[in-house]
Amino acid sequence: MAVKVAINGFGRIGRLAARAILSRPDSGLELVTINDLGSVEGNAFLFKRDSAHGTYPGTVTTEGNDMVIDGKKIVVTAERDPANLPHKKLGVDIVMECTGIFTNTEKASAHLTAGAKKVLISAPAKGDVDRTVVYGVNHKDLTADDKIVSNASCTTNCLAPVLHVLQQKIGIVRGLMTTVHSFTNDQRILDQIHSDLRRARTASASMIPTSTGAARAVALVIPELKGKLDGISIRVPTPDVSLVDFTFVPQRDTTAEEINSVLKAAADTGDMTGVLGYTDEPLVSRDFYSDPHSSTVDSRETAVLEGKLARVVAWYDNEWGFSNRMVDTAAQMAKTL
């Protein structure tokens, strides 16, 4: 029997998580309802026509206040308080919480009050939740007691699989990350006030340094790296696809060849298959649009100085890769119902 999923918040990640569910019937997930304050007509149109990922290949129509995708009716609501959503009536098992608002235990618990069994937050948690998961690294740690789970961030999902392999095979003393990140909705189209004055500037006109907790958050899934990592983000004028540039001190002398070898082996086998990618080609960001991997190692960029300072670069579609991990993590949570 399919696991029934609700999506709360139908923005970039909400819409793409819906696409990912619908494109992957093998996941065992069934999308039954969407909650968003926008009009059903507007949401249906934006779901069908995506500037980064193209037109949805199936049919998308509306029927009254609901959406019909590939002939299947999806109940649509516009409720501000998640506690009032019809989760119990619809038999919702897992909520994908994609608003960016209900990101702690207290707020996300409203979905449990409404009758859902578990909640997967599409963002780093603000405060304690039952578990933060990066699929491919610690997803097998999920238990029946994990009711409210964070899927971390797109950047943590890119970085953590790479670091997981490096920590196991070589060891990491300390490291710094820079993510060269496409602009997001948390920036301004034209100069306008923002709590971060750099993000207040026109997103399409500048490279914009800003903060990120993605590197530090890796410690939530790889505890032995706590306090050993930090990083920054540089937002750039592209609508999708980002890269992580990670420099680290290895625990022992290493070479670029060894680093590439262990990362390629991990990409080809085991839990990292489909999560971690690897390429020898001279690719650019446009080549990674709609790539479902969490991260793809660019072997041409791997470098080591005197065996004691190393650099690894990995690409990621910060929208589609992350949305696919939402599906994977939800499917893993379903096994604990």
Curated annotation (Swiss-Prot):
GO terms for biological process: glucose metabolic process; glycolytic process. The active site is at residue 154. It is found in: Cytoplasm. Its EC number is 1.2.1.12. The gene is gap. This is Glyceraldehyde-3-phosphate dehydrogenase. It catalyses: D-glyceraldehyde 3-phosphate + phosphate + NAD(+) = (2R)-3-phospho-glyceroyl phosphate + NADH + H(+). It is an enzyme of class 1 (oxidoreductase). SMART domains: Gp_dh_N (SM00846). D-glyceraldehyde 3-phosphate binds at residues 153-155, 184, 199, 212-213, 235.
